[in-house]
Amino acid sequence: MRSRCSWYPAHTMIAAVPPEVLSETERSLQTFGRVVLCQIVRAEGSTPGKVGWKLLARPDGSFVGNLGGGAFEALVKADALEKIRLGAGVDASEIKRYYLTEEATRGEPTGMVCGGMAEVFLEVMIAAPVLAICGGGPVGQALARAAAMAGFEVLVADDRPEFRNPELFPAGTHLTVVNRDYEEDFLSPLRHRDLYVAVVSRCWETDTAALAAILRQLRQAPESSLRYLGLMGSRRKIARVKDELAARGVDLSILGDVQLHAPIGLPIGGDSPGEIAISILAEVIGKRYEKSAVKS
């Protein structure tokens, strides 16, 4: 049976965007970190949908909105999900042309005989990267301010009441209360986002607890998009933390291709909280864009 086609000429008024598509786009970005918004931007001849119709594709295979249904919409959905599967960046956004004939796009017969053509803008949308900071002391505060200016969404986890004050951090910072052992699942709401983690807590015991908690949460959520993990401290302190993790049976190999940057930051000199924060953020940004600086 051939797919049904509605006739919408090219000059048809742009259709209103369903409000659920707009509201779900922001919500889905926060939940999944990456979506593809598909919009018909041009139509010629008979097409299933109007110019302006939108469809939101999400990593779990679900969709919001529609482009008119049928084999045409199925092809667009498949293309959108493929971009998500490949982890495409915003530069992979494109306008793609679909011919609504029996010998359709990519040579796949659709059963459609509309004879029209539709161009669809497949817009890859990625949520702001997240920098999770374990430790809300002077370095953590300076790092939060710098990261917010660089476009990161910031989360700060600390067990000390005096460092849970929103006035110490930039607006919009997620302040998470943890105990000294970091037993709370503080990364769970962000595990689908591009995630960067800096451990800059007050002592080797809390550093160890934070790292153990991060590795535990990664083991429980293998789909996590961890891009960077760094630990502040001297080489002696770092060695002690690693020894303690080994004694607890915590295996760093769960990080896979993610390197533990320890000591954290680029060796640019300076030891004030602000200077340390800049060195950390420089390393994080370098990792984000796959750029490296030579370390001594």
Task: Tell what function each PLM region has.
Residues 43, 202-205, 234-237:
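Short glycine-rich anion-binding loops that position phosphate/pyrophosphate groups of nucleotides
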Residues 205-212:
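Cytosolic regulatory regions of ion transport systems
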Residues 7-179, 189-196, 217, 237, ...:
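Segments forming oxygen-rich coordination pockets for charged ligands
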Residues 196, 212-244:
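ADP-ribose/adenylate-binding Rossmann-like module
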Residues 232-296:
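Adenosine-phosphate binding glycine-rich loop
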Residues 68, 135, 199-202, 229-233:
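Small/polar loops that bind or transfer phosphate-bearing groups
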Residues 87-88, 217-224, 249-252:
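Alpha-helix termini
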Residues 2-4:
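Basic polycationic patches enriched in arginine
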